[in-house]
Design a protein with these regions (language model features):
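Ser/Thr-glycine-rich phosphate-binding loops at phosphate-binding pockets of nucleotides
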Residues: 87, 91-92
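Cys-dependent protein tyrosine phosphatase-like superfamily
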Residues: 1-82, 94-158
């Protein structure tokens, strides 16, 4: 399951194992006009926890159909399943939380699973900075931003 936006998927492709697996492109979307990070300019201290929380809530609400479709796809397979976005933190984290929730994980376990991704985030950003769209990341201030390479995963403006 690939949760990257269409521009991300086109630019970086499916990777070296792409031809060996089945593939479901299920991009998480967030309409720019409902993106609290785009509609509220952060101050010099970065984004407030409330604003980041609002971003997560809005992405989850806007992508609810994608989350359900991904859960249904996993339920249909009799083998391993892999799901990812570009960094494996925000979109992947939202989906992982939903998956863990439906299989009965406790809230503390879900939170711990999400927090575990923080330990490798700098290495992930280092990798993404050299990706074909890395110029976008190199120009972004990452102070508190949930990973979203400046609109690559969002729906285009209408």
């Amino acid at each position: 399951l690939d949760f990257r936006g269409e521009p991300e998927a086109q630019v970086t492709g499916r990777g070296p194992l792409g031809a060996l697996t089945s593939y479901n492109h299920l991009p998480f979307v967030l309409a720019p006009e409902r993106d609290p990070i785009r509609t509220h300019q952060p101050g010099p201290e970065g984004l407030s926890p409330q604003l980041v929380g609002h971003w997560y809530l809005q992405v989850t609400v806007d992508s609810a159909d994608v989350i359900v479709e991904g859960l249904e796809a996993i339920a249909r397979v009799d083998s391993a399943a892999v799901f990812h976005c570009a960094a494996g933190k925000d979109r992947t984290g939202i989906f992982a939380a939903a998956l863990l929730s439906v299989v009965g994980a406790r809230e503390e376990e879900i939170i711990a699973d999400y927090q575990a991704s923080e330990s490798s985030l700098e290495r992930v950003f280092d990798r993404l900075r050299v990706a074909p769209y890395g110029f976008v990341l190199r120009s972004c201030n990452r102070t508190g931003l949930p990973f979203r390479p400046c609109g690559l995963c969002c729906a285009p403006a209408a």
